[in-house]
């Protein structure tokens, strides 16, 4: 089941800001939520550390437990390092591609745009946030959706990071994204240790 509660509170639980909005709040209150959040946490077991890292990864990409487990199983079948393959698959989810390109303010907004039918891949509407975009494919905003405020903002680069992921070729003006390569781990700005997640599932 996916988490649907307050994202700032979730960021504090995870120990990292999970949305742009959470960044400024997290700087003020980086400790966990609740009455005892400021207290130093007790030392934790190796299992608890791995589980916590798995949860952070799951929350960051807005996945259910079942979805993340499936990503791990898929990654095991690929020839590369399992953790790096997990990150690559997560980055090629349609929702993540929209986020990385600056077409959405958060992964949650990206999911909503896709669910509401605003996004196409190679000219065909795709309404599945987990859809795996392949190198060479073109992601676009549907023509009739381009007059909506979120996409006017996207065209102006409101949500774009200073440095767009190098495996994407993005035109904010045209509201198009070309996936030019499969992401490499060093190109992905996520503050996680994916090896701990692999160890969690391999236990």
Curated annotation (Swiss-Prot):
GO cellular component terms attached to this protein's record: small ribosomal subunit
Keywords, comma-separated and alphabetical? Ribonucleoprotein, Ribosomal protein, RNA-binding, rRNA-binding
Q: What subunit structure does UniProt give?
A: Part of the 30S ribosomal subunit. Contacts protein S5. The interaction surface between S4 and S5 is involved in control of translational fidelity.
- Asked whether the UniProt record includes RNA-binding among its keywords, one would answer yes
Function comment:
One of the primary rRNA binding proteins, it binds directly to 16S rRNA where it nucleates assembly of the body of the 30S subunit.
Could you confirm whether the keyword Ribosomal protein appears in this record? Answer: yes
InterPro entries assigned: Ribosomal_uS4, Ribosomal_uS4_bac-type, Ribosomal_uS4_CS, Ribosomal_uS4_N, S4_RNA-bd, S4_RNA-bd_sf
Q: Which Gene3D superfamilies match?
A: Ribosomal Protein S4 Delta 41, Chain A, domain 1 (1.10.1050.10), RNA-binding S4 domain (3.10.290.10)
Per its record, how is this protein called by name? Small ribosomal subunit protein uS4
What GO terms in the biological process aspect are recorded for it?
ribosomal small subunit biogenesis; translation
Taxonomic superkingdom: Bacteria
UniProt record similarity statement: Belongs to the universal ribosomal protein uS4 family.
| Cross-referenced CDD domains | S4
- The scientific name of the source species is Thermobifida fusca (strain YX)
**Molecular function via GO:** rRNA binding; structural constituent of ribosome
Domain named S4 RNA-binding: residues: 92-152
């Amino acid at each position: 089941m996916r988490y649907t509660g307050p994202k700032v509170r979730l960021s504090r639980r995870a120990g990292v800001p999970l949305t742009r909005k959470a960044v400024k709040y997290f700087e003020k209150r980086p400790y966990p939520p609740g009455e005892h959040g400021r207290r130093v946490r007790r030392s934790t077991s190796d299992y608890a550390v791995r589980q916590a890292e798995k949860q952070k990864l799951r929350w960051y990409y807005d996945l259910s437990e079942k979805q993340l487990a499936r990503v791990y199983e898929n990654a095991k079948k690929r020839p590369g390092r399992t953790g790096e393959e997990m990150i690559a698959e997560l980055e090629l989810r349609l929702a993540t591609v929209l986020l990385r390109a600056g077409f959405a303010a958060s992964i949650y907004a990206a999911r909503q745009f896709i669910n509401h039918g605003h996004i196409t891949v190679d000219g065909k509407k795709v309404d599945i946030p987990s859809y795996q975009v392949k190198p060479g494919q073109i992601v676009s905003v549907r023509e009739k959706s381009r007059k909506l405020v979120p996409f006017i903002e996207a065209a102006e680069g409101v949500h774009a990071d200073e440095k767009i992921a190098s495996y994407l070729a993005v035109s904010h003006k045209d509201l198009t994204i070309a996936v030019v390569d499969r992401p490499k781990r060093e190109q992905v700005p996520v503050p996680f240790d994916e090896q701990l997640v692999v160890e969690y599932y391999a236990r």
